């Protein structure tokens, strides 16, 4: 089969392309923007990419077009179609489908699907779960919205034996312009992790109850008792929104984690903790990851893995070798700077995918906990997600950035006033309308020993490499801005 993927450079569609290629299908695709790590993966697979969505791609004549949810029937300012290829597909009456539907029909059928859903932590928890099963010798397939460093790829088929495990990141975003259901309703999981739930995706959801309804639609697809064993729902016991989802109706076995009375709890610091099952120690995790959020992610992954026969002790031991996911507090580089006093210390540049206030706060809280109160943290963020661009959560930004010593916001193209939104942060916040201006602001403020965290769900204009290059020629400027006490 030859498939041509529209929107191939998205994390989900890029992973789907990798799976299709591994199954022996011919894969081509098109998109308008390419950035690592997905671009690296596609090039390594030898998948031919076409720039843009020109109607002439109809001549490629694949067996089916697989349409990503980036594609719409929207028009440009001059009234022409924004996606001419999609219009040509519709006019010609040739076969097309959505990514989630193709995945369900060609990859997931006959597999034990373990799905990880939630507003935050999906990618990391999915990667943890896949690694636990891999360490147990189960050769799971997986599709992750990032690149787990234990595997160095975002998707693989894994064992194709009947009932073999497939771990998938289950996104609540809509499937396609012609199928407005959440992607995850296509996956039919037997094991479902519900990590957390708050308002997001303001471009397609009106409010939190609208998202809760989609999560309940997902819950309805998990089996109860059956010939192949019960389905299981692993749920964060700290989340009121998830409690409401379960209260609306649940037909499966439930295992909770996180809260004091949950089935799975943790005792100890996030970097080294005991795993308790109903109060009894069943394993210990010791790893370099930081933050309470990763402790919760670990409990969720352990509870899900236990459903397919991996003991909590074995799962906890495997997590000790977990290497995280690219763009989750990934260190992109360190540059040694020498100040006027002669002291020398490295500036560390991090890359993180945080793009929602809760995720931003979680990221910075974890780093502050690791570094201590004396370290200087410079937070650079780009309000790039649709929810951020609409300003739906802008009031939470000052709260999310409290742990940073200095804050730099790339506000180019926003429909709301970022300077006004960040007023509660006082003089420690700067706003720039371009990447170049942002770089100048950061370089003027940088000092030996700083930790610079770049947060975006996109490429952020390649700011990480630009920063590292500029830091190589850094000279300490005349002080013009003090870190607030």
Regions found by a protein language model. Name each.
Residues 1-50, 61, 91, 216, ...:
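ATP-dependent carboxylate-amine ligase
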Residues 5, 19, 99-148:
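Walker A (P-loop) phosphate-binding motif
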Residues 11-16, 122-128, 150-152, 175-179, ...:
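Short glycine/serine/threonine-rich phosphate/pyrophosphate-binding segments
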Residues 39-43, 57-67, 73-97, 104, ...:
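Acidic, Mg2+-coordinating active-site environments of NTP-dependent enzymes
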Residues 44-51, 95-101, 144-151, 170-178, ...:
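Short gly/ser/thr-rich secondary-structure transition/capping motifs
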Residues 165-175, 349-355:
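Switch II (G3) loop of P-loop NTPases
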Residues 174-188, 357-369:
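Switch II of P-loop NTPase G domains
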């Amino acid at each position: 089969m030859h498939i041509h993927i529209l929107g191939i450079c998205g994390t989900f569609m890029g992973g789907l392309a990798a799976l299709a290629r591994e199954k022996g299908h011919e894969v081509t695709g098109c998109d308008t923007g390419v950035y690592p790590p997905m671009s690296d993966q596609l090039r390594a697979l030898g998948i031919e990419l076409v720039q843009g969505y020109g109607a002439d791609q109809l001549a490629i004549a694949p067996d089916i077009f697989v349409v990503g949810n980036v594609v719409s029937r929207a028009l440009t300012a001059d009234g022409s179609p924004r996606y001419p290829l999609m219009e040509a597909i519709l006019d010609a009456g040739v076969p097309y489908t959505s990514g989630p539907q193709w995945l369900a029909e060609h990859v997931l059928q006959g597999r034990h699907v373990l799905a990880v859903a939630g507003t935050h932590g999906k990618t990391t928890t999915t990667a943890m779960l896949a690694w636990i099963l891999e360490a147990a010798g189960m050769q799971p397939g997986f599709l992750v919205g990032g690149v787990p460093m234990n595997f160095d790829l975002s998707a693989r088929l894994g064992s194709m034996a009947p009932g073999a495990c497939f771990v998938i990141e289950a996104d609540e975003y809509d499937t396609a312009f012609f199928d407005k259901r959440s992607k995850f309703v296509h996956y039919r999981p037997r094991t479902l992790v519900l990590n957390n739930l708050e308002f997001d995706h303001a471009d397609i959801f009106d409010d939190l109850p609208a998202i809760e309804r989609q999560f309940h639609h997902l819950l309805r697809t998990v089996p109860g008792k059956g010939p192949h064993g019960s389905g299981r729902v692993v749920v964060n016991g700290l989340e009121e929104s998830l409690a409401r989802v379960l209260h609306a109706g649940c037909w499966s076995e439930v295992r909770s984690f996180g809260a004091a009375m949950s089935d799975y709890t943790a005792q100890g610091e996030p970097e080294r903790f005991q795993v308790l099952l109903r109060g009894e120690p069943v394993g210990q995790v010791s790893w370099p990851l930081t933050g309470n959020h990763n402790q919760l992610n670990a409990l969720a992954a352990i509870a899900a893995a236990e459903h397919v026969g991996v003991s909590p002790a074995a799962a906890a031991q495997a997590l000790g070798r977990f290497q995280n996911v690219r763009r989750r507090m990934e260190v992109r580089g360190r540059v040694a700077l020498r100040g006027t006093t002669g002291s020398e210390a490295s500036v560390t540049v991090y890359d993180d995918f945080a793009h929602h206030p809760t995720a931003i706060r979680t990221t910075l809280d974890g780093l502050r906990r690791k570094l201590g109160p004396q370290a200087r943290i410079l937070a650079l963020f780009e309000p790039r997600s649709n929810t951020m661009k609409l300003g739906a959560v802008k009031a939470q930004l000052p709260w999310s950035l409290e742990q940073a010593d200095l804050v730099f916001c790339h506000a180019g193209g926003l429909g709301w006033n970022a300077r006004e939104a960040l007023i509660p942060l006082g003089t420690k916040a700067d706003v720039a309308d371009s990447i170049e201006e942002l770089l100048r602001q950061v370089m003027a403020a940088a000092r030996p020993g700083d930790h610079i965290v770049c947060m975006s769900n996109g490429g952020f204009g390649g700011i990480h490499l630009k920063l590292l290059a500029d830091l190589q020629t850094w000279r300490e400027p005349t002080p013009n801005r003090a870190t607030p006490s």
